[in-house]
């Protein structure tokens, strides 16, 4: 009887080891470039600011993520205030640890996310500083009613105070600017 019990224990251990080996082998076959899905949060250091609504984040595994700030649209670099709006975003986040709450992936493969720095909503701050429009076309999909109202209010205040892009009499929205330009790959 002792031999039978010992054999069962050995088989149980062998099967457990085999199961673990299969599990880890399956995990190791995931591509290194596997991207976080909608609803996930990426924490990491901002290693590059491309423009007023796009940055590159490096996570703790060393993987870089191209992030498009959700619910806003900043002037293109070729537009008036484009470089100033990029520089304002860089002042806030470059080489700092942030959290990116993923809401979508855009047609260029960038993760669309709400960026937080120490709990502060950086996307809304860009709007409040007059460095971006509240991108209402997409914001309704991602924002709660309270967030939507807060962004709309931030834009209205920036406009009334003539901050950033609102210094111009009639600033051209980036989506109008892009519509008039030849289609180019996004950063």
Identify the function of each model-found stretch.
Residues 2-19, 23-187:
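Small beta-barrel nucleic-acid-binding modules, primarily SNase/OB-fold domains
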